[in-house]
């Protein structure tokens, strides 16, 4: 029989503290822990070691071992790499008898033996009955002097060098525990190596002395010496790559939504380029009187600039008054709208297409921002825009129904593109329009039929102001509301946006439905009418 003393409890407490695991997870078999005289079994089977391991010895955690294995079988596994001081199998004491958890701690007498065992077993050897290779790494209690803190990556190494050459090169800086050249499947050097020193200070000295110190044979750049990437560094780099990919997708989606004008895009880019030239800066001072325009008028401002340029070009060749030409051109926009009052939905669709063709023709002309001054000083802007406003209204009940989807797609592209590029080219007016719409944030005022949107999958951090700013580029927003859970005071991730016209709502749907923000894609659709749920 084995003698029971207080020593097992003492050893168990030490193990619990050093292993950082629940006390119930640590147990030792008394017959392997104690002899009848109470002395501790070091399980090394050797007489040339003292009672304690070397000061720099490492306690290793070993996972993926069979649950049926005992300390004796584990000892046979580890002893080929060096004398074993102690093996502790982690057991589940909630079971009777306690069952192995499939992992253990092993302490060798020397640090070298532990590292050799790790190099030979970790992610390499798979034990009988296991599906994954052994996992062997320093225990948490050893992290203060972890290998990753002393391991160097050596780049731009001559492919003619072997491990001995690297050891000779770095041995002046301290004791080298491991030196390994990275090789490909063909066994040839990849031109880089890993060197592990006994202490971090030695590794730091090697970096200071060797980094960029020489260019080795066959290398295009000086030698690179730095700390090897840790697992944390690798995970962080992977997350950064994922974030970069998401940002690239977001940028692609953003520009994809902003380029809905198709062939008209170059003309609007020309508008932006001309707006940034010093000769055009004076043009903005003459249009401050337009600051009171609503978003619908602002939406068509770029078209007016194009019309003015077209009129000026026509005047130089035909001696016609530029402003009268502009007025007649804009009249082409208003006349089809008047005709669209007919009862025929097909006629309304054709009139809308005619208006769109005129709009595109005007926008396609060479843009001259300096003409806006003359246009602002001579012609009533509100009157000239009234025809285009009527176009919005004329599409309210007729143009949005009865098979005019193709027309609406084209109108959506034209309106959304003009709005966004005009906003970029005329920041003063756009900022004033933004101030006029601030009261829309948080309100629940509804617009006309077909002008109210329901937005799903909003980021939880989005508020009323965020959703307002997101949907303002497509028209005059009269209300924007994100719904909040009254219990948690957190967003429910959906909201409503209402415009003063259906065209703006369709433009927002075309541009923002499916738009990705972070890990979410917005779902934007028309809000159901209250009458939809009524049977009569």
Curated annotation (Swiss-Prot):
<comment type="similarity">
    <text>Belongs to the CELF/BRUNOL family.</text>
</comment>
<dbReference type="Pfam" id="PF00076">
    <property type="entry name" value="RRM_1"/>
</dbReference>
<dbReference type="InterPro" id="IPR034199">
    <property type="entry name" value="CELF1/2_RRM3"/>
</dbReference>
<keyword id="KW-0678">Repressor</keyword>
<keyword id="KW-0963">Cytoplasm</keyword>
<dbReference type="InterPro" id="IPR034198">
    <property type="entry name" value="CELF1/2_RRM2"/>
</dbReference>
<dbReference type="GO" id="GO:0003730">
    <property type="term" value="F:mRNA 3'-UTR binding"/>
</dbReference>
<dbReference type="InterPro" id="IPR012677">
    <property type="entry name" value="Nucleotide-bd_a/b_plait_sf"/>
</dbReference>
<keyword id="KW-0507">mRNA processing</keyword>
<dbReference type="InterPro" id="IPR000504">
    <property type="entry name" value="RRM_dom"/>
</dbReference>
<dbReference type="GO" id="GO:1990904">
    <property type="term" value="C:ribonucleoprotein complex"/>
</dbReference>
<dbReference type="GO" id="GO:0005634">
    <property type="term" value="C:nucleus"/>
</dbReference>
<feature type="domain" description="RRM 2">
    <location>
        <begin position="150"/>
        <end position="230"/>
    </location>
</feature>
<dbReference type="GO" id="GO:0005737">
    <property type="term" value="C:cytoplasm"/>
</dbReference>
<keyword id="KW-0677">Repeat</keyword>
<feature type="domain" description="RRM 3">
    <location>
        <begin position="451"/>
        <end position="529"/>
    </location>
</feature>
<dbReference type="InterPro" id="IPR034196">
    <property type="entry name" value="CELF1/2_RRM1"/>
</dbReference>
<keyword id="KW-0694">RNA-binding</keyword>
<dbReference type="GO" id="GO:0006376">
    <property type="term" value="P:mRNA splice site recognition"/>
</dbReference>
<feature type="domain" description="RRM 1">
    <location>
        <begin position="58"/>
        <end position="141"/>
    </location>
</feature>
<comment type="function">
    <text>RNA-binding protein implicated in the regulation of several post-transcriptional events. May be involved in pre-mRNA alternative splicing, mRNA translation repression and stability.</text>
</comment>
<dbReference type="GO" id="GO:0000381">
    <property type="term" value="P:regulation of alternative mRNA splicing, via spliceosome"/>
</dbReference>
<protein>
    <recommendedName>
        <fullName>CUGBP Elav-like family member 2</fullName>
    </recommendedName>
</protein>
<dbReference type="InterPro" id="IPR035979">
    <property type="entry name" value="RBD_domain_sf"/>
</dbReference>
<keyword id="KW-0539">Nucleus</keyword>
